[in-house]
Amino acid sequence: MVKLRIIWRTMTVSQNPIVVLSLKRGNTKRSIKFRNGCTYRLTWPQFRSLRDSYPFLSRCFLTQLGDDLFRLEDGRSRIVCISKTVPLFSEIMEDFAVQQESENFFHLENEKIELVGSTDMLVCIQEQKSGEYECDCQGKVVLDVGGFEGESAAYFWMKGAKKLIIYEPVAEHVELIMRNMTLNHIKAEVHATGIGDKDGTQIIYYDKIDPGLGLHSKGKKSIEIKITNASEVLEQSGADIAKFDCESAEECLVHVQAQILQKIGYYIIEVHSAQIRKAIIEKFRSAGFVLENEIRKPNMPDFSVLSFRKIPLFRS
């Protein structure tokens, strides 16, 4: 059934589907003509990326500049990218005017928000469309642990939050958070620290600074980050809602006392393993919360976003 859907999608976007299907037999390039009249020399993976973006591509201009280099533009945006990222940029351009300031740095703007950041930030914005951060934050204080480049804080602000309290340990990310808070006049406290079981510092190893940088990252490079104990962060925040996306550091919430967890009424927590998921669910249920929603991450079976709401009048 899946194969039939792939064949059908291929036939509906290309004028020479037999040639397209022949690409699956090897790593060759062929000239593929799309239904909108545009022709590109593509491998099968390249065709698949363009095929999956075709509804948008049929309304914009896509020019092939090299073997795997494309210029994507419409009336308000202009981007040079590889085929693999065409679906991402196509989706982002539906919602924002996008200007590419360098190979991996972008300026986004629509009638509600303005942001600057990396390709990884665009991926995070795309993921927000799944509804993973959906909540009633109108007039509320939101604690944002794992602020990355400020895109999640901007999301909550756009949804009506009155203040953001942001924790992010990576200096490069903190700089972008500050820029994005200023661009949008967001009322925010920004803390250049991560969270853990106790105050201190920790060495993080990595190869690339990206959203996946965390306590269990591996690589040849290293940075030292500041850690603040999670109990103090929760207790001092005065927040109504807390969002955690901190690459396995969310596990420290298991060791926070129930009465401290209850100081915040709603939690959105991205978990990064089946083991952490189980421990977090057990902890929050025992602390007087109900699991209100869970969104699974596509292609990452052990990753999901859990939303917990405090049960009124519950006593631990």
List the model feature ranges, each with a label.
Residues M1-S316:
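Phosphate/nucleotide-binding beta-alpha loop and adjacent structural elements of enzyme active sites
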